[in-house]
């Protein structure tokens, strides 16, 4: 498929999505460090959790508004809020004011606004793609996001110390561009509803409050069993992925002996556990950026069932090795294997999600689906505690159980007879 054949909205949203992830990685990745420096580690933890909770509220509110009022309006509200709060944070961090409390308040509202806009962005991609184009679109989007995260983290790392106000100012300027692109270049894509009264309020119900409409809309999403299975699979998949910066990262820093990763004559590359963790993260990002589009071309004729089963299996196996191995080159090979599994699975899973989501409730579905990241963060954090009790092979076995559950959920969704039964019960 030629990229020029994609819907204009889609081309704009992919470009805008790259800039959004770049800015988010450039600034937000360092907010926990900023808060810890200003308020101490214990207080910073509570402040970050508060931001996460408000982000969940923003996601659900944005999902409801986008289905009720349209994608474009929701995007404009969210992106304008992000722009204004970045500007407020930049002013509050300047030498003329320097108010960490105002910076935090701006951060809080910023994450709410960004979360508010996110489901509308995801739903708009579904609105303007076809089942035939979605794997390519999601592959391109996945590649773009990883590239943006890599560059953003690099820029933020160099500019954070001594130039945080500049970072916030650049972010404010970037979000002006994003909001302007949405205002001038994006058209509304919300599908026309044939039965709006039934869609918004439920069949036969009188007009009620906004909260009742909100609850009824999400009740229908939670009753969709096939969607629930995919949500469980996505949550466990993300829980495994986050192990690298949680339990596995702790294990490598604590247990991995310093070793030569490469030796040529008298020259050698010697790494410890923390350095090995950085190399593994960089390897995963570089491989995704380098191989995502190639993987799409190579695997486009492979059946979805095979891609999802094999992808989940390779992904899980790679992380199981990371949980137990203390040999640098084995860890590097495991990272390659898990990245191949990731590239096989993720675009197909996203396309499958797009196919099962009803047009009238797309943003509500995407809002609930995006909560898998929040739940996975909690699971990954708990794994650090579990890992203090279980030996490394026990954690590897736990990852294996996660992987089996993922494949089981895929089987239930992809098997025609099982899928029909799920639809009948939904």
Whereabouts are the PLM-identified features?
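Conserved MFS/SLC helix-loop-helix module at the cytosolic interface between two early adjacent transmembrane helices
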Residues: 57-94
């Amino acid at each position: 498929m030629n990229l020029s054949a994609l819907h204009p909205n889609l081309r704009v949203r992919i470009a805008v999505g790259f800039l959004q992830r770049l800015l988010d990685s450039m600034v937000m990745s360092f907010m926990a460090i900023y808060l810890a420096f200003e308020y101490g580690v214990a207080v910073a933890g509570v402040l970050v959790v508060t931001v996460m909770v408000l982000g969940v509220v923003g996601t659900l509110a944005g999902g409801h508004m986008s289905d009720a009022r349209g994608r474009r309006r929701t995007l404009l509200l969210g992106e304008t809020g992000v722009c204004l709060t970045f500007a407020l944070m930049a002013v509050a961090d300047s030498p003329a004011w320097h108010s960490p409390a105002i910076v935090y308040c701006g951060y809080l509202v910023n994450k709410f606004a960004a979360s508010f806009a996110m489901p509308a962005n995801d739903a708009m991609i579904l609105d303007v793609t076809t089942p035939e184009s979605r794997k390519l679109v999601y592959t391109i989007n996945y590649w773009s996001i990883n590239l943006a995260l890599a560059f953003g983290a690099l820029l933020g790392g160099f500019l954070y110390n001594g130039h945080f106000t500049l970072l916030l100012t650049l972010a404010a300027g970037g979000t002006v561009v994003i909001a302007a692109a949405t205002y001038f270049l994006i058209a509304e894509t919300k599908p026309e509803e044939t039965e709006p009264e039934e869609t918004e309020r439920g069949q036969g119900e009188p007009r009620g409050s906004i909260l009742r409409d909100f609850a009824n809309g999400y009740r229908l999403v939670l009753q969709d069993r096939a969607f629930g299975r995919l949500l469980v699979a996505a949550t466990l998949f993300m829980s495994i992925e986050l192990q690298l910066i949680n339990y596995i990262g702790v294990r490598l820093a604590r247990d991995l002996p310093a070793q030569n990763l490469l030796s040529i004559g008298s020259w050698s590359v010697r790494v410890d556990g923390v350095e090995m963790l950085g190399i593994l993260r960089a390897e995963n990002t570089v491989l995704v950026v380098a191989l995502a589009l190639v993987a799409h071309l190579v695997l486009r004729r492979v059946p979805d069932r095979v891609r999802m089963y094999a992808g989940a299996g390779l992904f899980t196996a790679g992380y199981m090795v990371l949980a137990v191995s203390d040999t640098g080159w084995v860890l590097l090979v495991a990272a390659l294997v898990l990245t191949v599994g990731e590239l096989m699975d993720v675009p197909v899973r996203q396309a499958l999600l797009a196919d099962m989501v009803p047009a009238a409730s797309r943003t509500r579905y995407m809002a609930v689906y995006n909560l898998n990241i929040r739940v996975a963060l909690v699971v990954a954090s708990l794994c650090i505690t579990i890992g203090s009790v279980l030996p490394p092979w026990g954690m590897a076995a736990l990852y294996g159980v996660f992987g089996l559950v993922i494949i089981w959920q895929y089987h239930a969704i992809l098997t025609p007879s099982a899928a029909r039964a799920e639809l009948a019960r939904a």
